[in-house]
Amino acid sequence: MDRYLGFRLYGTMASWGTIAVGEERQTWSYPTKSAIVGLVAASLGVRRRDRKRQRELAEALELTVVVMESGMLLRDYHTVQVSPQRRRVRYRTRKAALESGELETILSSRSYMTDGDYLILLRLRSP
């Protein structure tokens, strides 16, 4: 007999991230498998850095998303101070980067879905 887990996700604002390049952070209009796996993994106590267990969980789950209401797209624009990109210079913290002296300002944009309502169904694949 198959084992299922069903639940509802509703949020006033969420981002279902796509690949982030440069200053643009886009979103899908529905929850991604990686987002759902991350939520399930966190609820099971699997650490984010535990790539092996994260991968095993992702491979063990089949996902169905029913979009009850995709919501509306919201774009957030803001300016961010950053240290200039230099070869071989990596800062361990944001504080260290900002204290480095020279700063540049970039325009950044993020996309979110507002008032999305989704039904999620997970099925555990047979071993």
Where are the model-predicted features located?
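Glycine/small-residue-rich interface belts in oligomeric ring/scaffold proteins
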Residues: 3, 18-88
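Internal, well-folded beta-alpha domain core
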Residues: 67-127
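Short polar catalytic/cofactor-binding loops
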Residues: 9-15
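Generic beta-strand structural signal
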Residues: 5, 61-63, 116-120
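Charged, low-complexity intrinsically disordered regulatory segments in eukaryotic signaling
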Residues: 1-8
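Functionally constrained cores in energy, signaling, and assembly domains
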Residues: 6, 22, 108-109
